[in-house]
Amino acid sequence: MAQTMTPSSITDGQKEEEPILRCISEGENLVIPATDGKALISEEKDVFKVWIDPDFLRLDANEPSNPTPEAVPRVYEMERDTTFEHMFDSVCKDKDKICWTQSQIIGFVQKYPNWLHPEGWATFFPFKSKGNFFVAYVFWYGPAWLDVFVG
């Protein structure tokens, strides 16, 4: 199943009878380093060596952020099919609280490639750019084989 990430341990979403997501990083010591906010996915050809979706530029999903402090991410695995809206709402209704910066996404991918879903499934990272909500889909095909799409 696909995985999704949040940059902090926010859990104010409503419970459902059949959970949408299951946290698989509980008890792990994952830490995203502080960032200066300047790194952009569209410019990280050394990280995403297979493909960087040109829609990052076409959709104007290419905005630097403010610097961010160290963050403790949570990694979730999807338990059932759903929409992005329902999936992210199950973690937190306030999407601003679960959004990553592009610098944080890059930092996580570089530091924790083993937490990206193998076997051709995407790992989803919610982020905002210029007031719009996007999802970065990161695919890991093995060491040095990453690509990223935006939707």
Where are the regions a protein language model picked out?
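A binding-site-centric feature that preferentially detects glycan-recognition modules on secreted/surface proteins
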Residues: 1-98, 102-151
